[in-house]
Amino acid sequence: EMHNPDRLMPEEAQKRLSEAKEGVRCQVCKSAVREAHAKAGEASKLPSFKDKWQRGSIVTDVVAKICHGPDYDKVNMGFFPTVAGNPPQWGEGIGVKQLKEGDKAYDKHPSGWKLFRYKGGDIEAAKERAAADMGLDIATYNVFTSALVRHVCRTVVDERQADDDLAELILDSLNEKPSKVIRDYCSNECASDTKARKSHWHDEL
């Protein structure tokens, strides 16, 4: 299943994935907007960006592709992606933990799901530990994590493009830090995290 490899996971893992999707909307939204803001900043250095008539379309293209991998155009033409699901490359450095009440991070992530970034060291060993903590084999964990970021990103960004102009928000704040865009765009996604509302703008991502 090249477009949705998570459908091949064991049924129990698929059920947990469905639960996790609701639990990490805020975290994925913030990460996606931060990545889009950074990529738009890189694009602003291109000669074509000096043309004010092209800026909008350049940033719109960045936003359209932020939840997808390098095969975005190829997939849209009907071809299979090189990597199953064509997940965004920035998601490769993200892991997921399932928390329990009493865990140190639970108060900040009352949904029971926490995303984190791998920081240096042996990333593969870190993934194996995270997989073991969730009771998954490493292959299933990798599919689970990739699918989680991919599906949620496309929900909070792609499905909102008709109603919320993220590209315009980013274009208006290119010379600023992304925090204001994140607050403005992700407020609805983060509001449901009621227990963590006072601190939900700070996390490891």
Which sequence ranges carry the predicted segments?
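Extracellular/luminal segments of secreted precursors and ectodomains of membrane proteins
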Residues: 1-205
